[in-house]
Design a protein with these regions (language model features):
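Charge-biased, low-complexity intrinsically disordered regions
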Residues: 1-228
């Protein structure tokens, strides 16, 4: 199968030594069981309420330190895993949105790991994790209306040849590459720091791919561990 291969700027080792991520490319099949994601999401919410996993706060704290290192304010713009967990701890649950989105949110909650899900077909070139120079463009929504922003110079971003696909490392994904269960090619990135055991990172990846295989039998996927 033809896979997108993301790249990581070596400069990121300065602020996030030991960063590693699981990159998963998927060629989707028709959805046969749309409830897989919603069921996983409910179970993951309960796991968060029960204080699982035991190392979750250490991993979140490590992400907060990395965010501060490139100038972000994690109390205002936290990493995606912390944002999800805060919502669950406040509301006790999380509403279902889309079968695939529900599944990767469940993985993020269950393993306290930032997970990005993207429509591969919307990419122009390969994903790259870099420091922004401030000239890049980012498409998003504000009060329901499409707007274009630019990252701060020195901000960590995911980008492709066209522009930013995710701001502040994993804080907010753009509209252009947004994923849904109807997309034919998908790319997922599970991002970890050393406070998350590597076997737990692989377990998170297995939860995602096992769930996708139940949801859409016949899909194909390829996983690659990357890092700095």
């Amino acid at each position: 199968m033809s896979s997108m291969l993301p790249s990581i700027s070596p400069e990121l080792a300065r602020i996030a030594p030991g960063f590693r991520a699981l990159s998963i490319n998927v060629i989707a099949a028709p959805v046969r069981d749309a409830q897989v994601g919603e069921i996983a999401l409910k179970e993951a919410c309960q796991a968060v309420i029960n204080g699982q996993p035991a190392w979750a706060q250490a991993h979140i704290d490590a992400w907060n330190a990395v965010f501060k290192a490139f100038g972000a304010k994690p109390k205002r713009t936290p990493c995606s895993a912390e944002a999800l967990r805060k919502r669950v701890l406040k509301d006790g649950t999380m509403a279902a949105l889309d079968p695939v989105v529900d599944l990767y949110n469940a993985v993020s909650l269950r393993y306290a790991v930032p997970v990005g899900g993207e429509n591969s077909a919307a990419y122009c070139g390969s994903p790259r994790l870099v420091f922004a120079d401030g000239s890049e463009t980012f498409d998003t929504l504000k009060e329901g209306q499409p707007v274009t922003e630019s990252p701060e110079p020195g901000e960590v971003i995911w980008r492709d040849d066209r522009g930013v696909t995710c701001r502040r490392w994993n804080w907010r994904q753009g509209v252009r590459t947004r994923l849904s269960a109807s997309d034919k090619t998908m790319w997922f990135i599970l991002e970890s720091l050393p406070e998350m055991p590597v076997d737990e990172l692989y377990a998170a990846g297995n939860m995602l791919t096992d769930g996708l295989e139940k949801m859409m039998p016949g899909l194909r996927f390829e996983s690659t561990l990357i890092g700095v």
